[in-house]
């Protein structure tokens, strides 16, 4: 696998100026990406990481249908055309894999709302029929206190099999080259092992990136689970070093992670370096001096 890639992140619903709530109207907004391909090539981009593209209630991380592109972005064919054009330009396509939770509009959860414990999908979620603070008649686990994000039960083999089958269709229909696993830090680790084995059997170079904010990156970035994780530690050091006119923090982090000593913690790992993303403030907003913007990117590319 070639880890020497330059990623460009696109949050499609924002990039394409789609409505914040799903209005059910199909508009091929995702085709806007086609006009940007020459710009991506000029920048030297080799891979595009797309935020959520599948049908959702609102922001994309509340998935309703893993098989259909969100109508606010267009049709499956529209996205296939974008993926084909990127591939023709020598640019890989990586999708956001949102597997920890779904939206309340997800078909299986709606079935549970209707049939309660009689639903064949009751075990797809972590449900408590004796405790509820909702109008559903039952309580359920969500992601970090957000009830619109219903936690999937990844201990359930049927759920895992369903998700792997959806990934198979993404590979077949769009030719995707990898996945970025949303909130990988709280994903079921047996599921990630199963996922790795499944996709690597299809394509040994299929790329698995995990979102990991803190903790020991080796817990997820290893030969059993993921190829890479997000390097939040160095992201902080990049802008802090500029704001203090002192490169000690980023230098300390890099030496701690990849220095020459045997106790350096991440020697041999391939971590994703980044300056900002959709979960944090824009780099230009956190820098005290906007003239430091190109310097941060120069430093990041030299890491």
Q: Where are the model-predicted features located?
A:
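Substrate-binding/active-site clefts of carbohydrate-active enzymes
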Residues: 1-6, 11-46, 53-169, 173, ...
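Hydrophobic faces of well-ordered beta-strands that scaffold small-molecule active sites
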Residues: 6-9, 48-50, 93-95, 179, ...
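Active-site beta-loop-alpha junctions enriched in small/polar residues
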Residues: 13, 53, 98-100, 184-186, ...
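Active-site-proximal helices and loops of the catalytic beta/alpha 8
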Residues: 87, 113, 168, 172, ...
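Short catalytic-loop micro-motif centered on adjacent basic/acidic residues
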Residues: 94, 178-184, 283-284
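Active-site-proximal substrate-binding groove within the catalytic cores of carbohydrate-active enzymes
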Residues: 259-303
